Each structure stands twice: as C-alpha cells, then as structure tokens.
Amino acid sequence: MVIPSNTTVYVDADSCPVKEEVISLARTFGKKMVFVYSYAHTMSLPKDVETAIVDTSKEAADLYLLQSVNRGDVCVTQDHALASLLLVKGVIVLSPRGHVYKEEEMPAMLAWRHTSQKARRAGKKTRGPKKFTASDRAAFYHALYAVLEKIAKE
C-alpha cells in the first residue's frame, strides 16, 4: 500500500494507556496527532497534540474517527469493531498492546466479541482483558515505531 507522507496518528484516547508513547513517536517521525475523547474524560495534553472532544454517547468517538481518517493514517484503539471498519478504509490500526490488526483476522475477533457479549447478557461471567503490563507497553512502542518507520521509508 502506498502511504501518503501526510499520515496522521489518531488515538481513541478515552482509555488509552499508551498516550505518552504515541506522542513521543509521532514527534520523532514528525506526524500530526489527533486524540479523540469524550468531554467526560478530560485530559491534559501538550500543545502540539490536536484534540477532538466528542459527546459522551456510546459511539461518538468511533463516528468521529470514521469520518476523519484517510487511507494510510494510523489509529490506536482497543475496539475491535472500530478496528475492522478502519481497516476497510485503508487505515493502519494498532492495539495499545502492540497488535497490528489485519483484515483477515477480524471475523474471528468480532465473533469472539459477539459470543462474549451474548454470554454477559445471559448473566454469565466472562473474563475481561488481562492487566496491562510493561511488556505490553514495550510491544506497543516497538510496533508503532516499526509502522511509522515503514511509512517514513515509503
């Protein structure tokens, strides 16, 4: 895929644990950053970080991201459904744990998500995500570095 040189790094920022890593690497590679979050999750960010503050409705940040991204942009999100929609638009999507999402894995990920939601609605307990660790943070840093380095070389 040919990536435009004006790539923007978007962050689904409400519960993103790797904001500092995104800021550091986007600065290193000279990329514009846009952090999208609801006004219920106010945060203090450096002046060079563009922010989009959205309503608290369930999908407001997702809708903003879907309307704003362009082919070749990068997005950090934990939301598998959002990731699947962004991939179709040609966006490079990473999880905060450093997983670079691929279109071919999304059907299985979404099916698992659906099964878990169904079980929770039926009153069953399901496992939540594992605790975020230092190795998750390092994996994210290396994955985002590799993505931005590849873009810089194209």
UniProtKB/Swiss-Prot annotation:
Q: Which regions span the lipid bilayer?
A: none
Report the Pfam families cross-referenced here.
Answer: DUF188
List the InterPro entries.
UPF0178 (IPR003791)
Residues in a coiled coil are: none
**What is stated as this protein's family in its record?**
Belongs to the UPF0178 family.
Q: Which PANTHER family match?
A: UPF0178 PROTEIN YAII
Specify the protein name.
UPF0178 protein ABC1688
Organism from which the protein derives: Shouchella clausii (strain KSM-K16) (Alkalihalobacillus clausii)
